Amino acid sequence: MSEETKSLNFIEHIIEEDLANGLSKDKLRFRFPPEPNGYLHIGHTKAIGISFGLGEKYNAPVNLRFDDTNPAKEEQEYVDAIKKDVAWLGYQWENELYSSDYFQQLYDWAVQLIKDGKAYVDSQSSEAMAEQKGTPTQPGVDGPYRNRSVEENLDLFERMKNGEFEEGAHILRAKIDMQHPNMLMRDPIMYRVLKKHHHRTGNDWCIYPMYDWTHGESDYIEQVSHSLCSLEFKPHRELYNWFKEHIYNYASDTLPMLPKQREFARLNLSYTIMSKRKLLKLVEEGIVSGWDDPRMPTISGLRRRGYTPNSIRKFIEKVGVAKRENVIDVSLLEFCIREDLNKTANRVMAVLDPIKVVITNYPEDKEEWLEAENNQEDDSAGYRKVPFSREIYIERDDFKEEAGNKYFRLKLGGEVRLKNAYIIKANDVVKDQNGAILEVHCTYDEDTSKKVKGTLHWVSIKHAIIAEIREYDRLFSHESPDSDKDKDFMEFINPKSLTIKTGYLEPSLATVEVGEQFQFQRLGYFNVDDDSTAEKLVFNKTVGLRDSWAKQKPKPQNNQNQNKAKPQQQKRSAISVIQQFGKKYTNLSEEKQLKVKSEIQELAKDVSYDDLEPLFGTAVKKAGTRIAVLIALKELLKNGLERNDAINEFIEKAKADKNEVLVAEASEI
């Protein structure tokens, strides 16, 4: 088996088999068939990615077909939103089609089924029909109208179409088998009376086809080769085949190819609700501001939050195509946007919780415009000028009056480097009557070649522009908010999912445009929100620089014997835990590697250069340990550690290694 064949997912294997068995490649055709009754969400991106991805792989057309058979719930607004979302993701459809395009053909085929004794009009109440249908372990029984004459069925069905009956008076059912082990095959409904205005056909129709009748026949009309849907539709496949095989008898001359339905596991995401009904409840009860609220899992919400098409497509690629349901950790999605924005977002400085720093030996009337690199990951990003003056803001938690040796930020008597500027030393503080610090008085040193361990971001007070900063977090505090049988999902709403702050930003951001993305250095990735105006800028936090939830996940309880032994064990140092992670890193799955990477990034906060440096000489064959060291080193460099010859040599050796993961980590530094 070739490497290429090994890497195929199970759907691609099916397609390759069909091609090998004589299906012409130019007959391949796929479709994405959303119902226009709501906004697309992250769960839909898997279905979109699979169908359009196959279209790209095989150079085959993909139809965007709207399954618009329920006028009670469907609107043009949703059609427009779906088209916008699919196009934004970077996919191009061959044809824009609608199930309503086929209403007349579906009706004509239904009439033919009645004539062949394969469909009948039932006039019972829904309760009576449900009772006759039986259970999964008990067969159904025939209803009193099952053996109506063909003539009576044709007459009633035409009168249903002409609007002579009220909703619920009659339905059309396929005549299959009321004792069938698959309950979906027990005379399923094909048509119901629904006197609602349709967003495309107006009032032309007052009977509407059901999903199972419409879905397969639309595939057949369009000559779709492979009809791909999620696993919950697997029991429907038998009915899908029954309908298409009977219709084939009526149209095989003009429509020679029968489509094939296959199912894949849908996308389930931790800390996320996918149900349209529940998402609607969040909107209606004002928990979120609308369908495009940046906390919503809708594509419009993700777009507004700052997610990119590339990050979402990369996420779908990493999730892959599976046959079994599983839950994907949302941290994988967050990892993908971090990786994407790390390469593309310009770095800027912003302070969100300011404390004033006065540089007492810097002239009051002096200001300088210093050169700052926009993005060290992108040579073409260039440089910008940032103003420096006597009074600046730094983050409040970047200063402590007293701190230990492992605190590398500003403290009394300690020195730090100001990003793109000078080294300062804290000498004194000014406090209010309650003891709260108002100002930190520092002196600066023009000699920037000195080695100091900490680097802080800052903003010149007199040049700062003010903006509203919306810091978003996960909307739910529970990993699986709709799985608790005893609690409503609304009880797991995270009260801290939105925090609004006033930010002080460097003046280069004064002319930004809606949608632009930046890394606020040391804080995270932010984008310009739609609510921004010329008078007031609004930024959304897309994602932090690291996974802040990794350390919050509950750990399983140890058994009693383990608990007894625990007091005798010394707590392992952060560096030893990082080494331990490194030993198993290369044996982990990609998803587990991402989780471990987040934990190493968190542990790096408690690691110094002196801890890491001895590990630079780790044996070549211990790739996992070297990867772990690189991950930690990258965090230290982000927080101001200066590169030296030992660091550069370690990175260059890693770049030349045969291990692809090691090379990738080294290349990111």
Give, region by region, the residue ranges found by the protein language model.
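Residue-level signature of the C-terminal ends
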Residues: 602-607, 622, 635-643, 650-653, ...
